[in-house]
Amino acid sequence: MAYFIDRRLNGKNKSMVNRQRFLRRYKSQIKQSIAEAINKRSVTDVDSGESVSIPTGDINEPMFHQGRGGTRHRVHPGNDHFVQNDRVERPQGGGGGGSGQGNASQDGEGEDEFVFQISKDEYLDLLFEDLALPNLKKNQYKQLTEYKTHRAGYTANGVPANISVVRSLQNSLARRTAMTAGKRRALHELEDELTQMENTEPVQLLEEERLRKEIAELRKKIESVPFIDTFDLRYKNYERRPEPSSQAVMFCLMDVSGSMDQATKDMAKRFYILLYLFLSRTYKNVDVVYIRHHTQAKEVDEQEFFYSQETGGTIVSSALKLMNEVVEERYDPAQWNIYAAQASDGDNWADDSPLCHELLAKKLLPMVRYYSYIEITRRAHQTLWREYEDLQAKCENFAMQHIREPDDIYPVFRELFHKQTA
């Protein structure tokens, strides 16, 4: 009776290896599709999975095929419409007049895009790939955890690129030795017995013939053991290990004044949700301080920061003063890596903008590793932007970007937090 043993280790996800290889091969197309998809999501739906579409032409394997032109002879079965020697007109290519989404095509050519679903973890990994907190340094107390990829022995499952030839051959040798040990022992005994019988008198031809047949059968069984089996294959294994690093705090400052309409606030919320997901996904121990401001600034929790309806006038310096107070009370710059991200529409009381410049230049920027300012507006820049432009020219740890449309959010986010090369 034959027994089939399933040695696959993926359980229900038996195509996981092929899926991972597919994600690596078409990473650029997938990341482009994700960048387009994130702008269509609601504020509360940024971290779920996503249906990704890739043009079919990008994933087709190269192949030789017959061209559309030329003359070819074919034999088709007859029916009640055609008889022998009838000439059949060449059909037009299909696809343009189908029922799929999009505009109709006049040339009859077309093909649907390839659509597949990626999980939440795959989505977030691709979303935040190659991003990191800038200028992160190791301070005295190490609590923040970064994850880095390390070799972690070998695994019985993987992609061909990671196969370990030496370890696989070692397993093959061990398996063949174990499976044939008894047969080789019996073979040596029979060979010794045959040798003794050939050297003794009288000659026993029938007994010698029997021994030779048994020896031939044993050798055949030993040779039938495969040289390499899927059970022998071993792949280099890699895993993400937590590595202690410096502790960090991120200040999120958001303008909620009356000049910020709902669309502008939603774009600011999208940016901060991306930032929060990035921090919580990449680092294990990061403090996040939420500050909302109009004429007055207030430290709030996550729920109130994103969903409170409170509004008022605009004095940006109130948020900067509150941030400075919180730093002095709870976050010693000698022990903490301090980061800040400020979002506003740029509308500020004119006399307050120089004060913002002074607070940043003299108090905050000397303490922070990185300060990013995002102005969300379609109007011309005002005094606050011009004051901050002067800071950007003088301070390397200050960055500013302009967001006009929801499509700008993700590119701006990647520009502000791209991983810096050493």
From Swiss-Prot:
Biased segments, Basic and acidic residues type: 77-90
One Pfam entry name: DUF444
Gly residues bias spans: 92-101
Domain of life: Bacteria
Alphabetized InterPro entries for the sequence: UPF0229 (IPR006698)
Location of region: Disordered: 77-109
Classification via NCBIfam families: PRK05325.1-2, PRK05325.1-3
Entry's family note: Belongs to the UPF0229 family.
Protein name, per record: UPF0229 protein Spro_2732
Organism: Serratia proteamaculans (strain 568)
